[in-house]
Amino acid sequence: MKAGKHTLLKKFSTFAVAVSLSAGILAASAQPTEAATTYQVGKVTYAKDYKLDDGTTYFTVKGKFPQIKEDSGAAKKINQALTKEKNRVIRQWKTDSAEYKKDAEELKKEELTGSEYGDEITYKVYSNDENYFSVMLSGYVFLGGAHGTPYRSCLTFNAQTGEKLTAAKAFGISKKQLNQKVKKLYLDKYDKKGKEAGFFPGMNAKDGRKQLENNLKNMDFNNNFYVKNGKAVFYAEPYAVGPYAAGFISVSATIQ
């Protein structure tokens, strides 16, 4: 049984929300990640199996989250934001589990068998220098069907102050200017590579570009970015500007 469309939309749009950590298994690791060059980074893990009354597991979640192992003022601010994001994810899992339980109980009532739902998150630090600390949380949720759905949440900080940055703030421009800039980058990419870049194909090149313009019209990239090698990498979710197989189609711009 496939979950409703609103469930997936909720997964992307709310990515979300805080919860008591006693609901699952939480452990801090002392092992730093290879990416650490300025801040020493460890990981916090979380895992929980949601079960029916008869003990059948219907939803399994696993998460690995970053945590800076320093106590400077900037590090504390970054950790507060990282912890908030981690708790949002765990809270969302708890919220989703109630809906998924209904699916599992319905299948059981009809004496049908379905695939166990699952959601797993890992992280990767893309920048850890004197300018930026930028990390991506990458998730993959499986709710039955031919394949699951990938999603991500990125957080970028001023490494000196610990301030969480939007893309507009990083570039020193308005949110409107930022989105105009990014949308132009996508259109330029289409002009150079067309459907070879993974965009939805149109009836012809002109039709495909128009379709991309329409898809980009209401998209906001102010938080859909991470920093790598001094560049802001912006991304669009699967299906936003291209088919599932194209994944996260991205463009980048050097931060001046």
Name these PLM-found stretches.
Residues 1-34:
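Sec-dependent N-terminal signal peptides of Gram-positive bacterial secreted proteins and lipoproteins
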Residues 31-256:
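Compositionally biased intrinsically disordered regions enriched in Thr/Gly
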